[in-house]
Amino acid sequence: EYFEGANKFKAYHDENFASLVVNPSKPAFSKPSTIIMVIGESASAYYMSAYSDAKNDNSPWLRSLRGNDNFIIFNHAYTSKCQTVPALERALTEKNQYNDKEFNQCVTVIDIAKKSGYETYWFSNQGYISDADTPITMVAKTADHAEWLSEDKALKGKYQYDGDLLNCLKKVDPTKNNFVVLHFMGSHEDCINRYPQSFAKFSEPGKFDMVLNY
C-alpha cells in the first residue's frame, strides 16, 4: 500500500505543484533567513523534563527557555497517528485525519516553501529506502537538495548520531532564504545506539532518558 501510494505521489506531484499558488501578505523577514524544521522519532513529552516532572533532567536546555519571549514551549502537541509513516504523511502534507484527501493528491510543506521563494533542503539520518520510509522519501526528494547520512560511503557500517546532521548545515547558503528539514533517528530502537557515550549520564546504558538528553 505504501509503495503504491508513493508511486502515485511521484506521478501526480508535478501537476499538484504547478497548480499550487502561494500569496504571502508580506515578507516574513526583512533579510535572508533560514528556517529549520526538526522531525524527531519516538520522542514523548511525558518523559522530557522540559514538559513534565521527569525523574531525570534530560532536556535542561529546552527547560531553560521557559519564560524566554523568543521561544514558545508548546505543551499540547499530538500526532494524528501512532505510527511514523501515516503520522508524517499527515504532518508534512495537507492530508489529515479530518479530510478524505489521498496522500498522492496533496501538496507538501516543501512545496509551500518553494513557492514562497525558499531554497529547500532535506537532511536525514533515517533510512533512504524501505517499506516504511518510501512515502517520506518521496516528499524529501521534492526538496532542491536531499541527502541521507546512510548513503554517505564514508559512514557505511557505522552508527550515525543525529548530531552528525549539523555538518550538513554547512552546505546551506546563509545569504539566501532557506527552508531546512532535519529528520532525526531520535529514540528509535535500539536506544543504546542513539547517543554518544559522553551523554550516558542517567541510570544504565540503553535508557530512553539518555537519548532525550542527547
Predicted regions and their residues:
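Active-site-proximal alpha/beta segments of enzymes that process anionic O-linked groups
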Residues: 1-37, 42-203
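Active-site-proximal segments of metal-dependent phosphoesterases and phosphodiesterases across multiple
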Residues: 198-214
